[in-house]
Amino acid sequence: MSQKITLIKDKVLSDNYFILRNITYDLTRKNGDVIRHKREVYDRGNGATILLYNREKQTVVLIRQFRVATWVNGNESGQLIETCAGLLDNDEPEACIRKEAIEETGYEVGEVRKLFELYMSPGGVTELIHFFIAEYSDSQRANAGGGVEDEDIEVLELPLTQALAMIKTGEIRDGKTVLLLNYLHSSSLIY
């Protein structure tokens, strides 16, 4: 017998920017026992992220920006080094990531490769992230990047070896970025 879920209550607690829900549900276990759970679920929509790499220069493009949640959780500056990313809104994942790459990094990418889709914090956040990689060259630089009006993004071009070392030193602490850097390192794309 598989588990059965019965929704008891779905109450919206906040919809200021994203949606915070209080969900009450009954979970029928495989043995037939029913357990009632009450959980808060944060629905911020789905997203996409991309790691840009240059095979010839052995480099990657990352960004640094303020992330309030890291600041609240003890990151003194709130600055986080990460891959380019954005919420899908009404876009398809590939269209979203192409738009975000131009806005955040300044690079207009050519061929992109989708790797996988992952839930990053499924205990309380609904977001499913689509992961991409793409090769870039200096000739694809369309602008300086830096994000849109309400963003303050620094574009970083780093040797892959340095970016990997920054994971070990704790300078890179973003999950999606660590996954993509390690994927690139373990593939034959850049070495």
Curated annotation (Swiss-Prot):
Gene3D superfamilies in UniProt: Nucleoside Triphosphate Pyrophosphohydrolase
UniProt keyword terms in alphabetical order: Hydrolase, Magnesium, Metal-binding
Superkingdom as given in the UniProt entry: Bacteria
Motif Nudix box: positions: 86-106
Positions with a binding annotation for GDP-alpha-D-mannose: 17, 38-40, 67, 85-87, 104, 127, 150-151, 176
MF annotations from Gene Ontology: hydrolase activity, acting on acid anhydrides, in phosphorus-containing anhydrides; metal ion binding
Cofactor section: Mg(2+)
UniProt xrefs under InterPro entries: NDP_pyrophosphatase (IPR004385), NUDIX_hydrolase-like_dom_sf (IPR015797), NUDIX_hydrolase_dom (IPR000086)
Domain Nudix hydrolase: 43-180
GO cellular component: cytosol
Catalytic activity: GDP-alpha-D-mannose + H2O = alpha-D-mannose 1-phosphate + GMP + 2 H(+)
SUPFAM superfamilies from the UniProt entry: Nudix
GO biological process: nucleoside phosphate metabolic process; ribose phosphate metabolic process
Enzyme Commission code: 3.6.1.-
Pfam families: NUDIX
Residues the record lists as binding Mg(2+) 2: 100, 104, 151
Residues noted as binding Mg(2+) 1 in the record, renumbered to the chain: 85, 104
Its biological purpose: Nucleoside diphosphate sugar hydrolase that hydrolyzes GDP-mannose as its preferred substrate, yielding GMP and mannose-1-phosphate.
Domain notes: In the dimer, the N-terminal domains are swapped between the two monomers, such that residues of both chains contribute to the active site.
Protein family: Belongs to the Nudix hydrolase family. NudK subfamily.
Oligomer and partners: Homodimer.
Identification of the protein by name: GDP-mannose pyrophosphatase
Organism: Citrobacter koseri (strain ATCC BAA-895 / CDC 4225-83 / SGSC4696)
